[in-house]
């Protein structure tokens, strides 16, 4: 099945609704993906890219239903990765002499995957053209390291379509092909996820390359990507977003992620978040347990954030393995213009937080002071965590924050008001976790200042996951 893109250009790619892992298992494609291949029928017939190798046979069969394979004059390979050029072996078995236009680096990659050095390769570089008849040409633009050394884009004159390779794409599967036809929230979420997890390391290359392409002074009516939608409605909107994302991007957002063995580090994360919110309620704070969260969502939030707090328990004197792996991935992504702080709990010796701080600094983050707690944090330790959050909120503020002021009411009056307004603290009889009405439980949408009587009946203890019926009034407050 083909889809008309524009005039004599048809999409002949493959949708992949089921794929959930990309680049091994490093990228979770939660909304599937597509492998976009395009067939151009002018005086010359041109195929731009193929599909993932697992769809090779199906792709060639479908292509044969669109055109006699022998009538394909040229094959353009913008990128040699297997999700772009994976069907070449199956296709070239049918038309072995058809010329393949690609960069010099692509020949090495294609031969490395397919092992056919005898194929009819034609090397192109930036500014080279290929006449396809009817007054139209293909213009080639090398885009090395966006995101492989072999990458290039292809521009078609007359129709003003830019075949952009991986740039401006997204792992997003939909029966509809064009950007104006799909759910806009989903689309732009996947665009940002794609950029944050794949193209961030090459941000410094993106702006010069876009500037170079714009320097050709060629109109762009459509951007036909290798994955996801074709941008036909205001295609420059995604270009403008890329230029924004390349500029050491950050929002007024803080990401907290952690791993924990006994919930001690989780308690610290909650308290730090409370402190941040207390001082700067306008900053967005997102908390993730790495063992229970989508790694790529965490990394996308780091990309969006002005700073990140990373927590780990100590295990054999080092950080938890999932934290170590995620920090290593952040090192490779080379985030810029971001601050960081390490925190965590330990038992007898510690070591993980210091190691984590060093790794975050090596990853290019501007470091703030770290925070450690021994064993399970008590009320005093949790207050230190909240104070750490308050300090972080002030240090990382994008604009000066108003000084917090407290009313100087007598201590007896404050105590009386608190008791009268909020009621007693409650303690879980199973794990001893304490609910403080003054603090609430933000992770369950229980706001600070919520008395126990107003806590929803479906409330669960954050540590042992049991319900309200196992809670008793804290012994020190029982009358």
From Swiss-Prot:
One of its GO terms (molecular function) is electron transfer activity. Its cofactor is Fe cation; FMN. FMN binds at residues 260-264, 342-369. Residues 423-474 form the Rubredoxin-like domain. Anaerobic nitric oxide reductase; uses NADH to detoxify nitric oxide (NO), protecting several 4Fe-4S NO-sensitive enzymes. Has at least 2 reductase partners, only one of which (NorW, flavorubredoxin reductase) has been identified. NO probably binds to the di-iron center; electrons enter from the NorW at rubredoxin and are transferred sequentially to the FMN center and the di-iron center. Also able to function as an aerobic oxygen reductase. Residues 254-393 form the Flavodoxin-like domain. Signal peptide: none annotated. Keywords: Cytoplasm, Electron transport, Flavoprotein, FMN, Iron, Metal-binding, Oxidoreductase, Transport. One of its GO terms (cellular component) is cytoplasm. In the N-terminal section; belongs to the zinc metallo-hydrolase group 3 family. Fe cation 2 binds at residues 83, 166, 227. Fe cation 1 binds at residues 79, 81, 147, 166. Pathway: Nitrogen metabolism; nitric oxide reduction. It comes from the Bacteria. The lineage of its organism: Bacteria, Pseudomonadati, Pseudomonadota, Gammaproteobacteria, Enterobacterales. InterPro entries: Anaer_NO_rdtase_flvorubredoxin (IPR023957), Flavodoxin/NO_synth (IPR008254), Flavoprotein-like_sf (IPR029039), Metallo-B-lactamas (IPR001279), ODP_dom (IPR045761), RibonucZ/Hydroxyglut_hydro (IPR036866), Rubredoxin-like_dom (IPR024934), Rubredoxin-O_OxRdtase (IPR016440). Pfam families: Flavodoxin_1, ODP, Rubredoxin. HAMAP family: NorV. Homotetramer. Transmembrane segments: none annotated. Binds 3 Fe cations per monomer. Binds 1 FMN per monomer. Its main location: cytoplasm. The keyword Cell membrane does not apply. This is Anaerobic nitric oxide reductase flavorubredoxin.
């Amino acid at each position: 099945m083909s889809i008309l893109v524009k005039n004599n250009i048809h999409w002949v790619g493959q949708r992949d609704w089921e794929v959930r892992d990309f680049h091994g298992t490093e990228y979770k494609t939660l909304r599937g993906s597509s492998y976009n291949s395009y067939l151009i029928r002018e005086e010359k017939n041109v195929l731009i890219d193929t599909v993932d190798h697992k769809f090779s046979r199906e792709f060639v069969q479908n292509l044969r239903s669109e055109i006699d394979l022998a009538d394909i004059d040229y094959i353009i390979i913008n990128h040699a990765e297997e999700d772009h050029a994976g069907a070449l072996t199956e296709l070239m078995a049918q038309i072995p002499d058809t010329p393949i236009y690609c960069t010099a680096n692509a020949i090495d990659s294609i031969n490395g995957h397919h092992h056919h050095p005898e194929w009819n390769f034609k090397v192109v570089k930036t500014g080279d053209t290929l006449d396809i008849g009817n007054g139209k040409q293909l213009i080639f633009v090398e885009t090395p390291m966006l995101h492989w050394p072999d990458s290039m884009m292809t521009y078609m004159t007359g129709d003003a379509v830019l075949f952009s390779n991986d740039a401006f794409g997204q792992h997003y599967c939909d029966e509809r092909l064009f950007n104006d036809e799909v759910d806009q929230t989903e689309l732009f979420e996947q665009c940002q996820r794609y950029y944050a997890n794949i193209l961030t390391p090459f941000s410094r290359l993106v702006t010069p390359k876009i500037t170079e392409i714009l320097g050709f002074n060629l109109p762009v009516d459509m951007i036909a990507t290798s994955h996801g939608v074709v941008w036909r409605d205001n295609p420059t909107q995604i270009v403008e977003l890329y230029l924004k994302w390349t500029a050491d991007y950050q929002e007024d957002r803080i990401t907290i992620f952690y791993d924990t063995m006994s919930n001690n580090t989780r308690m610290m994360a909650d308290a730090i978040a409370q402190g941040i919110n207390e001082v700067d309620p306008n900053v967005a704070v997102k908390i993730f347990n790495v063992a229970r969260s989508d790694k790529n969502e965490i990394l996308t939030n780091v990309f969006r954030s002005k700073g990140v707090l990373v927590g780990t328990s100590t295990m054999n004197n080092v950080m938890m393995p999932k934290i170590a792996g995620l920090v290593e991935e952040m090192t490779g992504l080379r985030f810029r213009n971001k601050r960081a702080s390490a925190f965590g709990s330990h038992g007898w010796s510690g070591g993980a937080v210091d190691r984590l701080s060093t790794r975050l600094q090596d990853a290019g983050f501007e470091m703030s002071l770290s925070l450690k707690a021994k064993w399970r944090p008590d009320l005093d330790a949790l207050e230190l965590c909240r104070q750490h959050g308050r300090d972080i909120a002030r240090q990382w503020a994008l604009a000066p924050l108003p000084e917090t002021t407290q009313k100087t009411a007598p201590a007896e009056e404050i105590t009386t008001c608190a008791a009268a307004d909020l009621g007693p603290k409650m303690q879980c009889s199973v794990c001893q976790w304490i609910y403080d009405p003054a603090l609430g439980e933000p992770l369950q949408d229980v706001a600070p200042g919520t008395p126990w009587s107003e806590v929803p009946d479906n409330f669960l203890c954050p540590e042992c996951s049991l319900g309200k019926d196992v809670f008793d009034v804290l012994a020190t407050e029982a009358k």
